[in-house]
Regions:
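Aromatic-rich, lipid-facing transmembrane alpha helices and their immediate juxtamembrane interface loops
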Residues: 1-152
């Protein structure tokens, strides 16, 4: 059953992007990929600091959660699609999603044996995720600045 959940996390969210305007998805796809990079770094730090571990995964991933390569990218695109450029709305939506992630989703994943927190608590995880969200917003602003200044 866990493998079905993991494969669903890895594949299904990509189809949700088909519901959105293609041009706007393209605009935010880079920040989505940057989110995957940031989460990959976070998972590497977490492994070294013993903050959390991935207990079970799809066969080709080791310590990286399946959520990095799909769910985080798609959710990042969705959040930017719906809230950008308004920082206040963006941060409010991210705080709500990060609280749900830290206090609802992670305990569920731990309960079914996919994920465990060790030397970081739920609030610490929330802070990590919110910090990444702020970095992502700044990255998107930088992209906008670069592409607005570029000659067409």
């Amino acid at each position: 059953m866990n493998q079905i959940i993991l494969w669903g996390i890895l594949v299904i969210p990509w189809f949700l992007l088909l519901l959105l305007d293609k041009q706007r998805v393209k605009r935010f796809f880079t920040v989505g990929l940057f989110a995957a990079l940031m989460m990959t770094i976070a998972y590497q730090v977490a492994e070294k600091m013993h903050w959390w571990t991935v207990q079970e995964n799809v066969f080709f991933l080791t310590s990286m959660g399946a959520t990095i390569y799909c769910l985080h990218i798609v959710i990042t695109i969705f959040v930017f699609y719906l809230t950008y450029p308004g920082f206040i709305l963006y941060i409010i939506v991210n705080i709500i999603l990060d609280l749900i992630h830290g206090y609802v989703i992670v305990p569920f994943l731990a309960k079914i044996g996919l994920y465990n927190l060790y030397d970081i608590n739920h609030f610490g995880l929330f802070l990590v995720m919110t910090t990444i969200a702020i970095i992502l917003y700044l990255f998107q602003r930088l992209l906008d600045f670069i592409f607005e200044e570029s000659p067409a």
